[in-house]
Structures are given as structure tokens and as C-alpha cells.
């Protein structure tokens, strides 16, 4: 991977632990609905709402590419089912998305991104989710940021990777994507012909049939793999 000029990063579970974030955001939404629209929570548990979203994707697969629309559609359906007006959808989603942005970056993220930029790499973020790097206050760490919603296709579709190459003016061989999900980040990057680096913070077992170009446990491992420390020590 000596030709790498651009590095792209997944967001959720690569730059922060997203599991607790989403659980807390869904709980905040459920609590708000219970206070303001109690018939919704009387009828639907958190798990019921998750199943509803799964069912909606089954009926309309393109919702995988529009995660915000998916959540709003589930709220709309829940409201109609229990006899509320759909006006609850926007304020309810606002509660969720505010909590969804209460993330804590892994300690190694910001220093590593600064070092990568200093080393001359162009940096981008590629996410299937609806986290907004501007709202998170980390947009300055990236040269560009792309979402599945902005390009119309979610990973593993190659479009996000292709658009990243276009924006940074590099060939697929000159771009490396760093992500945690085998089925989306790794499989999608491989299909697009870019280099893929598995950020395996939790030391998960490999997925059969999906072989990344490299595997690291944290950002220090990524820096070491790219030789950033050695470069800086000689300067």
C-alpha cells in the first residue's frame, strides 16, 4: 500500500463506540414519546420499533440507503396506528438525532487524524449512518465527508468509494478505507477496488470470504502500518 494518497474512515464503531450511543438515543426517543404521545409507547416497545424498521426495509429495500427516512417512516406508521397525527414525527426525530450525536471519540482518533494530515494524506469519512461530522464538531479533521444518503447508495455498494476517489482525485489503488464492518466497509471497498484496512478494535474473528489488505487494532496500529512514526522521527 505504498501508493496510498487518500484515507477514508467509517464513523460508527470505527471512530467511536456507537452501540451505547444508539441505545441511549432510542431510549431518549422512547421516553419522550412516553411523556408526550403515550399511546405509542403503550403499544410499541423499543424492540417492537426495531422490528418495525426491519419490516419496513423488507417492504422497501431502498430505505437501507435512507436511514433518516427509515426512522421517520417508522414513527409515522406508529403514530397512525395508535391514532396520533403525523405531526409528531419531526419533533420526535429531533430528540433522537440530538442524542445520536452525543458521541465520545476514541482517545486515539483526533491525534491520529492530525498526524495523518501532517503526513500529507487526504482524509475523508464514509458512513451509512446519519451522524453529521459538522454537528459533531469534527468536520475540520476531514477534507470531505460522504454519507449513504448523500450519494444514494449504502456500503457495500461501491458508489461511496467511487465518489471518494473522484473527490480526492485518486485512483482506487491510491485510496485506503478504514472500517470495522466486514459486510459493508470491507466487502464494499474490495468490490470498488480500493485498499481496505480492518479496524478490529474488539478483536472479532475474521469473516470467511472477506480478506482485508491489512488489519489493525487501533489508530496507533494504523499509524505504525503507514510508517508515520518513522517518518516523523527522521524529520
Identify the role of each PLM range.
Residues 2-107:
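N-terminal helical cap/lid subdomain that shapes the substrate entry/recognition surface
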Amino acid at each position: 500500500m505504498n501508493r496510498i494518497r487518500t484515507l477514508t474512515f467509517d464513523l460508527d464503531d470505527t471512530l467511536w463506540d456507537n452501540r451505547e450511543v444508539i441505545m441511549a438515543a432510542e431510549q431518549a426517543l422512547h421516553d419522550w414519546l412516553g411523556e408526550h404521545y403515550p399511546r405509542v409507547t403503550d403499544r410499541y416497545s423499543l424492540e417492537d420499533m426495531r422490528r418495525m424498521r426491519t419490516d419496513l426495509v423488507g417492504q422497501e429495500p431502498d430505505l437501507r440507503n435512507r436511514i433518516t427516512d427509515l426512522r421517520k417512516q417508522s414513527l409515522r406508521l406508529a403514530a397512525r396506528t395508535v391514532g396520533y397525527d403525523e405531526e409528531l414525527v419531526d419533533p420526535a426525530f429531533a430528540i433522537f438525532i440530538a442524542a445520536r450525536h452525543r458521541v465520545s471519540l476514541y482517545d486515539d482518533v483526533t491525534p491520529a487524524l492530525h498526524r495523518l494530515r501532517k503526513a500529507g494524506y487526504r482524509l475523508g469519512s464514509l458512513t451509512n449512518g446519519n451522524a453529521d461530522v459538522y454537528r459533531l464538531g469534527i468536520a475540520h479533521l476531514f477534507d470531505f465527508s460522504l454519507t449513504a444518503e448523500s450519494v444514494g447508495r449504502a456500503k457495500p455498494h461501491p458508489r461511496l468509494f467511487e465518489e471518494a476517489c473522484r473527490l480526492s482525485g485518486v485512483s482506487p489503488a491510491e485510496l485506503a478505507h478504514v472500517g470495522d464492518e466486514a459486510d459493508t466497509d470491507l466487502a464494499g471497498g474490495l468490490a470498488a477496488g480500493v485498499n481496505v484496512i480492518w479496524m478490529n478494535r474488539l478483536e472479532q474473528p475474521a469473516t470467511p470470504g472477506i480478506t482485508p489488505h491489512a488489519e489493525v487494532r487501533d489508530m496507533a496500529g494504523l499509524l505504525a502500518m503507514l510508517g508515520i512514526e518513522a517518518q516523523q522521527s527522521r524529520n
